[in-house]
């Protein structure tokens, strides 16, 4: 499932004018008269819903919160082979949450972990734990190593 940000082709930090510009552009390029391939599937209602949600500050805040929660439920305890490895020390701690800006899309504090998430970590052979987490703004997954204090 792609995010509303991906539907409109904007970053999570996009301003209202940027959202409006992206919305107009996406509608124009997705219009059935503008598409050469008649079998191409155009989801104009999805574009409209994405814009309506993101342009309203209250809806956007709620949507962002849902994105974070759904990302956390996607399964953290996988092998992690081939993923970039970060230490929990690389994260900022604030209000019972560890966060880090994404190294790929640079979305601010888009990789988040809570104490509950860390309790689900997988023990490693070095006496620590590993957990796999996804950026809330793009498809990047990283492996986070940490130790109990």
Curated annotation (Swiss-Prot):
GO terms for molecular function: metal ion binding. The DPH-type metal-binding (MB) domain can bind either zinc or iron ions. Its main location: cytoplasm. PROSITE patterns: DNAJ_2, DPH_MB. GO terms for biological process: protein histidyl modification to diphthamide. Required for the first step of diphthamide biosynthesis, the transfer of 3-amino-3-carboxypropyl from S-adenosyl-L-methionine to a histidine residue. Diphthamide is a post-translational modification of histidine which occurs in elongation factor 2. Zn(2+) binds at residues 102, 105, 135, 138. It comes from Candida albicans (strain SC5314 / ATCC MYA-2876) (Yeast). Gene3D superfamilies: DnaJ domain (1.10.287.110), DPH Zinc finger (3.10.660.10). The keyword Transport does not apply. The gene is JJJ3. This is Diphthamide biosynthesis protein 4. Belongs to the DPH4 family. It is found in: Cytoplasm; Nucleus. Keywords: Cytoplasm, Iron, Metal-binding, Nucleus, Zinc. Pathway: Protein modification; peptidyl-diphthamide biosynthesis. Residues 82-147 form the DPH-type MB domain. Residues 3-67 form the J domain. PANTHER family: DIPHTHAMIDE BIOSYNTHESIS PROTEIN 4, DPH3 HOMOLOG-RELATED. One of its GO terms (cellular component) is nucleus. Transmembrane segments: none annotated.
């Amino acid at each position: 499932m792609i995010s509303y940000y991906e539907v409109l082709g904007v970053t999570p930090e996009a301003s209202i004018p940027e959202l409006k510009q992206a919305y107009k552009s996406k509608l124009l390029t997705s219009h059935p008269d503008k598409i050469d391939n008649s079998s191409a599937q155009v989801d104009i209602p999805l574009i409209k819903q994405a814009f309506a949600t993101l342009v309203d500050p209250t809806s956007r805040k709620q949507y962002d919160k849902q994105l974070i929660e759904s990302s956390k439920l996607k399964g953290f305890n996988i092998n992690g082979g081939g993923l970039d490895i970060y230490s929990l020390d690389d994260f900022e701690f604030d209000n019972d949450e560890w966060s880090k800006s994404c190294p790929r899309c640079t979305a601010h504090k888009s990789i988040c972990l809570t104490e509950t998430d860390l309790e689900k970590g997988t023990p490693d052979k070095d006496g620590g734990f590993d957990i796999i987490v996804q950026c809330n703004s793009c498809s990047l997954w990283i492996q986070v190593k940490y130790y109990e204090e």
